[in-house]
């Protein structure tokens, strides 16, 4: 018993550090394959500001592989744009991304295996001006620099793009962003990718959300240095909610909204049917009752369609 106790104490630090999901294809991994039907669309435009191949070099030579357009469209693992140390890319979309149930979008890098991980911070904006960063965590030891082609354990990485190999996206959930008056989580228009640099030198290193220096392959002093952005796939798209011409939202009361368990509908018109849809259009509930039970639905945004003899109207509801 004493021997087992001491063994547990010896292993505990490594157990605590390996606390996030594993590489793509392993049990429990959150990686999403590029052809997963979850993806509704892909980034349509991109702008890139390159960083240097080596941020500490006396002569500045920028990363140069690929062009911004390579970051648009579906992931393919080969058509990429390299950002260099601290380089950035800003992506926009045909439709905004919305804060739905679970992950809302995913970022793809082109790593050739599960351990050579070039990482990036991810930020989102609803106006293209004010960006807010997803809380990222890196538990990789900073005692030794990860070399130019060194290995990183994916289970020590969370909310950093580049966690998985090529063709597998790192998912991001908008609900994890901080609440702010300048951020409309239901209508994200821009996603920014920022290379983490990777050096453990505090003069140039970058910090995660809890103050850890992010240690990833460094130096990457070649043309494809830094994060290699392949694509950004959209899972939850924003849907404009419009009333039909002959019905007005003032004719209805829907409460409570947001709700924990049910919504009640009061109407001036006789209600024929009520449908509840996921934000992506999947019909989840059909009812003729004015009280709709949502207890079995996960937290997120939904569309409530009310049908009367005069027409129909759709309203967004939020399940907490």
Locate the predicted segments by residue.
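Intrinsically disordered, low-complexity repeat segments enriched in small/polar residues
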Residues: 13, 188-194, 215, 270, ...
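Glycine-centered tight beta-turn/hairpin loop motif at sheet-sheet or coil-to-beta transitions
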Residues: 86, 129, 310-311
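C-terminal outer-membrane/trafficking sorting elements
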Residues: 245-320
């Amino acid at each position: 018993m004493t021997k087992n106790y001491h063994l547990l104490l010896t292993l505990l630090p490594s157990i605590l550090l390996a606390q996030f999901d594993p590489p793509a294809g392993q049990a429990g991994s959150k990686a999403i394959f590029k052809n997963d039907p979850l993806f509704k669309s892909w980034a349509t435009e991109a702008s890139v500001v390159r960083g240097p191949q080596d941020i500490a070099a006396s002569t500045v030579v920028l990363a140069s592989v690929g062009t911004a357009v390579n970051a648009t469209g579906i992931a393919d693992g080969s058509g990429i744009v390299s950002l260099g140390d601290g380089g950035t890319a800003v992506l926009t979309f045909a439709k905004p991304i919305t804060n739905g149930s679970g992950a809302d979008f995913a970022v793809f890098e082109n790593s050739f295996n599960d351990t050579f991980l070039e990482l990036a911070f991810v930020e989102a904006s609803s106006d293209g001006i004010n960006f807010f960063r997803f809380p990222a965590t890196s538990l990789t030891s900073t005692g030794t620099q990860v070399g130019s082609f060194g290995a990183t354990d994916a289970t020590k990485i969370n909310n950093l793009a580049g966690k998985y190999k090529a063709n597998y996206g790192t998912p991001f959930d908008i609900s994890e962003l901080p609440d702010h008056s300048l951020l409309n989580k239901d209508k994200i228009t821009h996603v920014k990718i920022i290379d983490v640099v990777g050096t453990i030198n505090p003069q140039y290193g970058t910090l995660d959300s809890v103050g850890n220096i992010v240690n990833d392959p460094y130096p990457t002093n070649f043309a494809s240095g830094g994060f290699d952005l392949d694509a950004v796939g959209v899972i939850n798209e924003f849907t404009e909610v419009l009333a039909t011409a002959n019905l007005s939202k003032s004719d209805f009361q829907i409460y409570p909204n947001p709700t924990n368990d049910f919504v009640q509908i009061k109407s001036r018109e006789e209600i024929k049917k009520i449908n509840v849809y996921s934000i992506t259009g999947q019909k989840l509930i059909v009812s003729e009752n004015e009280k709709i039970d949502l207890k079995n639905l996960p937290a997120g945004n939904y569309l409530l369609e009310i049908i009367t003899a005069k027409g129909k109207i759709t309203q967004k509801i939020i399940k907490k």
